[in-house]
Amino acid sequence: MRFRSVLCSHLGRPNGVVVEGLRLAPVGDRLATLLECPVKSLPEITGPVVADAVSAMVPGDIILLENLRFHPGEEENDGVFACELADTVDCFVMDAFAVAHRAHASTNGIIRFLPSAMGLLVQREVEAMGQALESPERPLAALLGGAKVSD
């Protein structure tokens, strides 16, 4: 079965304003190369441009929305913005384990408006973490890292 896929993501920390160097069109281009199929990158996150593009999709089409963090409501978990994100799609699949803990409109707010599920990557991460906590193989070494390891 082929689906119509609307992808959303963020890049960097533009703090609710458009930063030209953080647009997702290059990400869409790279994704199209990796998938060997077209990916339509939109210059908007919500609104008529998005609604029209989604309405015109056929099974197998992929759309990538613009950087979610360009919208001030994303990191504030704004309910109106979350509802706008949900308006043009039928369901939500969360497949970004690294940001699943964040209470943002696209990770937390949207689930109030749509049937939601975890994606395969998140499922694998959760299973691996569960295995590491419940029955780790010994000897064991834990490596922690990241830009905000103190968090």
Residue ranges and their predicted role:
Residues 1-151:
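Active-site loop-to-helix "anion-binding N-cap" substructures in soluble metabolic enzymes
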